[in-house]
């Protein structure tokens, strides 16, 4: 999936795909764990598979970015690295990005969805040029242990099963009322809506 769109707030979530975001105008905040990373035009962010992340827009004006979402089979030889490692600092600043990378990202945007082999080849170029600029650490070192991240991780690990809010709260060691408030305040939807969205997103990315 490759789209250029107006940047917006996106709640904490994770998926088993690589996500690359390139700011094309204005600014964007990329949240990973409890850290919020500021991005400006030309900066490129990398979110490896199964890393919880979110986006915030704090800058007035026109804020746009290109988002590339690549399933594991399209990242070929980089897939093994991305399963166990993640960037310590997930942003490559614009001054460190070769012009070729922007050209290739634009080429991916213009590639027909049916031309998966072409898009995959372009993606290999982006990764070959950029992965070496990221300091990779064990994935377990990237993230957070707070309740928001425990919640996202729990849903991601268990959404294929049948379970209730009460069962989830018990497993996380909190009351169901605390968990219910978390869904409404942080995710702006109830438990069932969030769980159904996770199942739908999985079906769409298969």
Regions picked out by a protein language model, each given a short descriptive name:
Residues 154-158, 193, 205-206:
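Short alpha-helical segment immediately N-terminal to, or the first helix within
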Residues 114-119, 141-146, 160:
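Cytosolic nucleotide-utilizing catalytic cores of signal-transduction proteins
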Residues 79-137, 153:
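Amphipathic alpha-helical segments enriched in hydrophobic/aromatic residues interleaved with Lys/Arg
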Residues 134, 162-198:
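Basic/polar phosphate-binding segments, predominantly the helix-turn-helix DNA-binding elements
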Residues 67-70, 109-112, 196, 200-206:
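Short, intrinsically disordered, charge-balanced linker/junction segments flanking boundaries
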Residues 97, 143-151, 187, 196-199:
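N-terminal positioning helix adjacent to the helix-turn-helix/winged-helix DNA-binding module
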Residues 1-86:
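N-terminal regulatory/effector-sensing and dimerization cores
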